[in-house]
Design a protein with these regions (language model features):
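FMN-binding flavodoxin-like domain, especially the glycine-rich phosphate-binding loop
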Residues: 3-4, 10, 16-17, 21-33, ...
Length: 144
């Protein structure tokens, strides 16, 4: 099964922590939007997409990625995200994927991330990372 993990993460590294945990759990590499050259040369059975929330919406790099995304090679997707105060980011990412005609499996995985002005310092923590690893396995099992 061809599984890919792509994400955007700010300087805080919250979403990057989740992306690396998902990738390690599934034995693949996490690729960063806006930094890595992300090409879908072969069909993707399951694409994990991760982001944080920036001024109540996905980051502009993530939105641009979706604008340019050719959905043809992507069979299924799953969403993970971090948030400071507004937890709807998972639903926003799911909507972007579905808007491209991509099947989104399961419910988005979201957890708090360290953010200025919140009580989320130290998040995502080890429990969050264990939970996102379990999420990765569950989503992969849905598309086997």
């Amino acid at each position: 099964m061809n599984i890919r993990v792509i994400y955007h993460s700010s300087k805080s590294g919250n979403t990057q922590k989740l992306a690396k945990a998902v990738a390690e759990e599934l034995g693949v590499r996490a690729e960063r939007m806006g930094k890595d050259s992300i090409v879908f040369a072969q069909p993707v059975d399951l694409l994990f997409v991760g982001d944080g929330i920036y001024w109540a919406k996905p980051h502009r790099i993530t939105r641009r990625f979706f604008e340019e995304l050719d959905p043809a090679p992507i069979k299924n997707a799953a969403v993970f995200a971090t948030y400071g105060n507004q937890f709807k980011i998972g639903d926003d990412l799911r909507t972007l994927l579905q808007g491209k005609g991509i099947n989104v499996v399961g419910e988005p995985f979201t957890c708090k991330g360290a953010s200025v002005g919140t009580k989320n310092q130290g998040r995502p923590d080890e429990t969050d990372l264990q939970n996102v690893r379990a999420f990765a396995q569950q989503m992969a099992a849905l598309v086997k």
